[in-house]
């Protein structure tokens, strides 16, 4: 059995204890890498809005990562993509992206977009493996020294 075969992805409430733990790790990492004006993560309450879907990936009953899909006007935005450092390289990110893409397609979204940090190289590789390409700012984002923008047509 492969590591990916043991990963399940399920809808979750971002206000749950396990989601808060994952989001706390993610926010701490981003806050250690970038100044506040260049951090674009959503709060737990913002993630709980009706137009946002949230999932947790788990393996053997343990939360390993999370991701959110904000369904916006004409596109979907990937938010709060995070994989626990101990679980990286084991298919968790792929499982999360596949789940998110399935949902985006089922709701008729034509494109997925994201903003990520400039030095998060492993995230850039993951997104490229799944067909994302670099693009310019979108929505309310502006060009900045720490942002990389990517998108994928569905």
Predicted regions span which residues?
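Actinobacteria-biased recognition of intrinsically disordered, low-complexity terminal regions
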Residues: 1-2
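Acetyl-CoA-dependent GNAT
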Residues: 5-79, 84-85, 97-99, 103, ...
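Conserved catalytic-core motifs of GNAT/GCN5-like acyltransferases
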Residues: 14, 113-116, 128, 133-149
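Ser/Thr-centric signal marking residues that sit
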Residues: 66, 94, 116
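Active-site acidic-Proline motif in GNAT/NAT acetyltransferases
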Residues: 84-90, 118
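Charged, amphipathic alpha-helical coiled-coil/dimerization segments
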Residues: 90, 98, 102, 107, ...
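Helix-turn-helix
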Residues: 123
